Amino acid sequence: MPRFDALYEDTRKQLLILPSWRRSISGAYDEKTSSVYFDGFVETDYFKFYNGLINDERLLSKMREKGYKGLFCLHPIFMKQYVDFQNNDVFDVNEGFVDYNKVFAESAAMVTDYSTIAFDFAYLKKPIVYTQFDQKQFYEDQVYDKGFFEYETDGFGPVCYDLDSAVNELVELIDNDCKNKYIDRVENFFVNIDKNNSKRVLDAIIEDDKKRNK
């Protein structure tokens, strides 16, 4: 994809957590901010999982030991819920819009769930951990169906279905300096990993235009 050409690397000891949204627990839509505060948010499994993850003492202890910091970025639809999450000395909860290319560049590893931004991060050959504690409900509630991409067999990292397994994977990952064990999947999935995606698309458009005008 052409947008991959804008990706760059400035890797630091940072763990990025960037999950998608949930239709069933989002507040009403606001034209100016795209979201409103949802009063029942703290009672949801979504909040309990991610607040538990960024405050898990095993994970925090390992990150302190290895000198890592964490950045938790909510989806824009959930942006106003940042006040519900508990900050600590390791994790910052982002309060506004995200410069995705910047946080991708600076992060050594990423946690996400079903978000397609995982493809951008994987393109940088950096490790990903998927957190899908609500997989069945997610596909029942969202506005789109499960596609051909199977996370367990096609994904760019382990799939975790509960908090304990997610913490275990992250502790091991950080303990090994975020070495990517799924690099073969990344290299087999992407035909080209370079800065020439825009050129290839443009060349294909020009070639197609020539054929149409013969």
Where are these regions (language model features)?
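Conserved catalytic-core segment of nucleotide-activated headgroup transferases in glycan assembly
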Residues: M1-D84, C160
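Short, solvent-exposed loop/turn segments at secondary-structure junctions
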Residues: S20-S24, H75-M79, T116-A118, D134-Q137, ...
